[in-house]
Amino acid sequence: MKYLIFIGIAAMALACAPDKPKNQEQYPDQPTKSVVEEIIADPTKGIGAVKKVTLKTPLEQERVGRGLAIFEMKCSACHRLTTERVVGPGWKDVTKRRQPEWVMNMITNVDVMLDKDPEAQKLFELCLVRMPNQNVSIGDARDILEFMRQNDGAK
């Protein structure tokens, strides 16, 4: 009787075991960490999915409004719109010092940027606090960038 119970439990455990690890099943097209590690940081564009950003003049006011809302919700606790450093650096003139691709990659790919990008590492040394990953989409990062451009005086 004990053997039958043991065999029954073992059979159920084997039947419920997955064939593949879940991450391969759900995300087959996602690059592995070794692929990400091979990416060399472009000092002007950073590391991430954003390779080229086309900026328009005049500013896209809808994007500016959405960027302001995202800033207030996810960024304002650590960043100011002036040069004042709170937890993170102030945002004044960021778009004059950095390429738009770098800004967007820093927002959307912060962990890799802080680990591998020399400019992001300098900011980390200055602030001594890692910027948390806010899970900002590329579209939302573009809206934040447009808001930052307005903050820096772009028209």
Model regions and ranges:
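C-terminal capping alpha-helices of c-type cytochrome domains
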Residues: 101-106, 129-155
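Bacterial signal peptide processing site
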Residues: 16-20
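Electrostatic cytochrome c docking/interface patches
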Residues: 23-70
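Gly/Gly-Pro-rich "capping" loops immediately C-terminal to redox-active cysteine motifs
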Residues: 64, 68, 79-109
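Axial heme c-ligation environment in periplasmic c-type cytochrome domains
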Residues: 86-94, 111-140
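Sec-dependent bacterial lipoprotein signal peptides
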Residues: 1-14
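Short pre-active-site segment immediately N-terminal to redox-active cysteine/selenocysteine motifs
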Residues: 63, 71-74, 82, 130, ...
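Protein kinase-like catalytic domain
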Residues: 79, 111, 148-152
